[in-house]
Amino acid sequence: LGIKMAVPFYQVQELIQQHDVAVFSSNYALYAEMSRRFNNTIQQFVSAKDIEIYSIDETFIELNSYSQTDLNELAQEIKATLWQWLALPVCVGIGHSKTEAKLANHIAKKNSYFNGVCNLLHMDLCSKEALFQHIDVAEVWGVGRKLAKKLHALKIHSVFDLAISDPEQMQRKFSILMKKTILEL
């Protein structure tokens, strides 16, 4: 039906009624327990010191000490184990920065070609640029729909457009956070 996560109920109430969608309230105790199990499972593959729990449903792993590891294989193993042990469907994004990793995760979710794992570290520059040209700038971590409208007005429509923009100029127009985001792409 195209209902995005975290959309307020009142915004989709009519659509829900039209399609007879079942709605359930959140069970945060269960989510917290599943999050704990999720992160414990990840510790079967990487050191706890390399894990940063970002939110109840998001974790970053620092991969610098795993340079001799096939990261695609590791990600697929983690993904398969989380499904087998916890029945949690996950996608994995691998990048040079948290911003790039979140973008890679978005790509993995939206493109079945990647089989749930998008590794931007080993993607050649031409492929990466081609991919970024087809992703709306609103998908970049920290940009969102409101800021994307302002970027669109500046002819910055895609992730690629943002990545090649002048970080200093964008800092002057927006903020230091925008500059940092650009430098992380």
Name each model feature, range by range.
Residues 21-24, 47-54, 71-75, 83-92:
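Short secondary-structure capping/junction motifs at helix and strand boundaries
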Residues 109-117, 156-159, 179-181:
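A short alpha->loop->secondary-structure connector
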Residues 24, 29-36, 160-185:
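Alpha-helical interaction/regulatory segments in DNA maintenance proteins
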Residues 1-56, 60:
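Residues that scaffold, gate, or flank divalent-cation-dependent active/transport sites
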Residues 73-138:
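Long, highly charged, low-complexity intrinsically disordered interaction regions
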Residues 152:
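Polar interaction faces of repeat-based domains
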Residues 60-79, 155:
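Catalytic palm subdomain of template-directed nucleic-acid polymerases
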